[in-house]
UniProtKB/Swiss-Prot annotation:
Gene Ontology MF annotations: proton-transporting ATP synthase activity, rotational mechanism; proton-transporting ATPase activity, rotational mechanism
Membrane topology annotation: Single-pass membrane protein
Key words of the record: ATP synthesis, Cell membrane, CF(0), Hydrogen ion transport, Ion transport, Membrane, Transmembrane, Transmembrane helix, Transport
Protein's name in the database: ATP synthase subunit b
Signal peptide: none
Chief location: membrane
Function statement: F(1)F(0) ATP synthase produces ATP from ADP in the presence of a proton or sodium gradient. F-type ATPases consist of two structural domains, F(1) containing the extramembraneous catalytic core and F(0) containing the membrane proton channel, linked together by a central stalk and a peripheral stalk. During catalysis, ATP synthesis in the catalytic domain of F(1) is coupled via a rotary mechanism of the central stalk subunits to proton translocation. Component of the F(0) channel, it forms part of the peripheral stalk, linking F(1) to F(0).
Family annotation (Pfam families): ATP-synt_B
Spans through the membrane: 15-37
Species lineage: Bacteria, Bacillati, Bacillota, Bacilli, Lactobacillales
Record's subcellular location: Cell membrane
Length: 166
């Protein structure tokens, strides 16, 4: 060992002195710095653990919110589908009702028109019958009032027809 110390040009006393100083420094560092450093490291470790736990908690909350939003979106889509289905059914009912009502009104209009046409026909026939009767009576009166030759009868009918046109 002496050889080692001689090669380094250190004396045994100096070496012991350095060792004592080093040990004292270690004790001082342990007493004054090691505690605060380990406390700081422990706080840092606890903070990292807390941050990891918080991140995991936030991830779970985000996943839960995403699931809730997805369920709400699914419910909204289902509700929209139901609303559209109901609206289509109501539109079909309204369409059928309007068509049925229009058909009924058209049938009523056709029936009224048919009745009006029949009434007009009846009125025209009655009026024509009345006119024919009046004409017949007028001709009979003229025939009775004078005895007519064929030419007179022809003139009488022509005059009567002219009288009708006027």
């Amino acid at each position: 060992m002496q050889f080692m110390f001689a090669a380094l040009k250190l004396e045994l006393g100096d070496t012991l002195y350095y060792l004592l100083i080093f040990a004292a420094l270690l004790l001082l560092v342990k007493h004054f710095a090691w505690g605060p450093v380990t406390k700081m490291m422990e706080k840092r470790r606890q903070k990292v653990i807390s941050d990891l736990d918080q991140a995991e908690s936030d991830r779970k909350k985000a996943a839960l919110l995403a699931n809730q939003r997805e369920a709400a979106l699914k419910d909204s889509k289902q509700e929209a589908t139901q609303i559209l289905s109901t609206a289509k059914r109501n539109a079909e009912k309204t369409k059928s009702s309007i068509i049925s009502q229009a058909d009924q009104e058209a049938a009523a209009i056709r029936e009224r028109a048919s009745k009006d046409a029949a009434q007009a026909k009846t009125d025209a026939l009655n009026e024509a019958r009345d006119q024919v009767a009046d004409i017949s009576v007028a001709i009979a009166e003229k025939v009775i009032s004078k005895s007519l030759s064929a030419a007179d009868q022809k003139d009488l009918v022509d005059q009567f027809i002219k009288g009708l046109n006027d």
